[in-house]
Amino acid sequence: MSDHGRMHSTGSEVAAPVAPDPDTEGVHPHFNRRVTSFRARRSTISDGQQATWDRLWPQLGRQARDGDEPPGPLDTDAWFGRHAPVVLEIGCGTGTSTLAMAQAEPGIDVVAVEVYRRGLAQLLSAIDRTAATEHPVSNIRLIRGDGVDVLTHMFGSASLTGVRVFFPDPWPKARHHKRRLLQPDTMALIADRLRPGGVLHAATDHQGYAAHIAEVGDAEPRLRRVAMDSADLPMSVTRPVTKYERKALAGPVVTELLWERTP
């Protein structure tokens, strides 16, 4: 797992696991019915992470689905205990960027969605560590599930100030392009969930996927491409450079793309 959130395949392209997968158990059986953008993974969390999970997950996290039942609408005001702009991050990975950006904007509530329990456990532990600091983080909530499912069922039209999708799996082989997260249907769904003036911020280090994202984003009539340094954006688009990126500075260039929801 990279520290900016991408989880890499280990071995051949993965079929459905033959035994329960502790990292995706309870998440992906339903999604065998449609093409998904995530891969099956096997991973464990430490005893310390498990203890933190047991203590904080009931308050800060929730499972998107209970079996085959679709999730219901999410009341973010009740969950966060306040009314504030909401940003949805799809595929938060280990939460390095999630935490840093939430700390920089305490007035914005961040809902971080991730399929893999290990990544969520790392983010939950990082949030817990801020409790002993001068500025404990209280504006992050976590959902374990599929991002498209969460967008479809848990958020209504014009309910989001922003959507972040950082380093989604590029699925580089042509026969797997249909598995890419940012497809025309997903772009249309994101556009519907953004309020007018809300923004979609995407980042990838795969140039082929960057071109694909740019094409499908520009083709969505309710989204207008804007520059990263545009004034009056409703949320920060200053994304922290992670350890993974620092190690890869001589490698692939990171492409960042930004769209604004039209009135």
From Swiss-Prot:
<feature type="binding site">
    <location>
        <position position="169"/>
    </location>
    <ligand>
        <name>S-adenosyl-L-methionine</name>
    </ligand>
</feature>
<feature type="binding site">
    <location>
        <position position="205"/>
    </location>
    <ligand>
        <name>substrate</name>
    </ligand>
</feature>
<dbReference type="InterPro" id="IPR055361">
    <property type="entry name" value="tRNA_methyltr_TrmB_bact"/>
</dbReference>
<keyword id="KW-0489">Methyltransferase</keyword>
<keyword id="KW-0808">Transferase</keyword>
<feature type="region of interest" description="Disordered">
    <location>
        <begin position="1"/>
        <end position="33"/>
    </location>
</feature>
<feature type="binding site">
    <location>
        <position position="146"/>
    </location>
    <ligand>
        <name>S-adenosyl-L-methionine</name>
    </ligand>
</feature>
<dbReference type="Pfam" id="PF02390">
    <property type="entry name" value="Methyltransf_4"/>
</dbReference>
<keyword id="KW-0819">tRNA processing</keyword>
<comment type="similarity">
    <text>Belongs to the class I-like SAM-binding methyltransferase superfamily. TrmB family.</text>
</comment>
<protein>
    <recommendedName>
        <fullName>tRNA (guanine-N(7)-)-methyltransferase</fullName>
        <ecNumber>2.1.1.33</ecNumber>
    </recommendedName>
</protein>
<dbReference type="InterPro" id="IPR029063">
    <property type="entry name" value="SAM-dependent_MTases_sf"/>
</dbReference>
<dbReference type="InterPro" id="IPR003358">
    <property type="entry name" value="tRNA_(Gua-N-7)_MeTrfase_Trmb"/>
</dbReference>
<feature type="binding site">
    <location>
        <position position="89"/>
    </location>
    <ligand>
        <name>S-adenosyl-L-methionine</name>
    </ligand>
</feature>
<comment type="pathway">
    <text>tRNA modification; N(7)-methylguanine-tRNA biosynthesis.</text>
</comment>
<feature type="binding site">
    <location>
        <begin position="242"/>
        <end position="245"/>
    </location>
    <ligand>
        <name>substrate</name>
    </ligand>
</feature>
<feature type="binding site">
    <location>
        <position position="114"/>
    </location>
    <ligand>
        <name>S-adenosyl-L-methionine</name>
    </ligand>
</feature>
<dbReference type="GO" id="GO:0043527">
    <property type="term" value="C:tRNA methyltransferase complex"/>
</dbReference>
<comment type="function">
    <text>Catalyzes the formation of N(7)-methylguanine at position 46 (m7G46) in tRNA.</text>
</comment>
<feature type="binding site">
    <location>
        <position position="173"/>
    </location>
    <ligand>
        <name>substrate</name>
    </ligand>
</feature>
<feature type="active site">
    <location>
        <position position="169"/>
    </location>
</feature>
<keyword id="KW-0949">S-adenosyl-L-methionine</keyword>
<dbReference type="GO" id="GO:0008176">
    <property type="term" value="F:tRNA (guanine(46)-N7)-methyltransferase activity"/>
</dbReference>
